[in-house]
Amino acid sequence: MNAEKTSVAPNVDHAEIAKFEAVASRWWDLEGEFKPLHRINPLRLGYIAERSGGLFGKKVLDVGCGGGILAESMAREGATVTGLDMGAEPLQVARLHALESGIQVDYVQETVEEHAAKHPQQYDVVTCMEMLEHVPDPQSVVHACARLVKPGGQVFFSTINRNGKAWLMAVVGAEYVMKMVPKGTHDVKKFIKPAELLGWVDQTTLKEQHIIGLHYNPLTNTFKLAPGVDVNYMLHTTAKQD
């Protein structure tokens, strides 16, 4: 069964936006608050490119792009990239960094629901990384992503599982013990179980293709993609053909 979900009010948590606005100027500091994003980006990019059959020449939308770490890297692969975010400061940082780097990315400040209403079935690839756990209605985001992708196109989601281990690793460990991200970055109540995400996907034209975990080893201080979705995970889906 295919269903569409449309938000009446903007699907925005202003407190979440404020968190990222406050540290936006340090988005491209490789040793700053966003160091983990810089470190996992090659893994994310590699997974997206491989599962999409390459990004060169493809039209790509990065939902919740922030300061543009993933968006820029996909543009470097030869994609035509649009970055979407509701934070004015992160977008300003993203635009400036792209200009300094000589990389063309079109950054737009609007919700994914608003963008889907204007640009249905316009993208070969849609990415939504570490964003679902920061909005009031993540289901609405999933539905909007499904509307944005072309038939046969690829949609990627990444988020955090909701369980005791995820709370221990992503909140206690990352925020308080190892101080990898600022305190208060995550709210365990907003974490999303894979079954919940897959349930929302099943309500759309998207079909699950692959799911994989993103794992951090504190002993070696390294990240890797591997089976096991008990903390961070990525989901690859494709849009059904007409």
UniProtKB/Swiss-Prot annotation:
- Entry's Pfam families? Methyltransf_23 (PF13489)
In Gene Ontology terms, what is one molecular function of this protein? polyprenyldihydroxybenzoate methyltransferase activity
Q: Which CDD domains match?
A: AdoMet_MTases
SUPFAM superfamilies in the record, alphabetically? S-adenosyl-L-methionine-dependent methyltransferases (SSF53335)
* Residues annotated for S-adenosyl-L-methionine binding in this entry: R44, G64, D85, M129
One GO biological process term: methylation
EC class of this enzyme?
transferase
**Known pathway:** Cofactor biosynthesis; ubiquinone biosynthesis
Q: What is the name listed in the Swiss-Prot or TrEMBL entry for this protein?
A: Ubiquinone biosynthesis O-methyltransferase
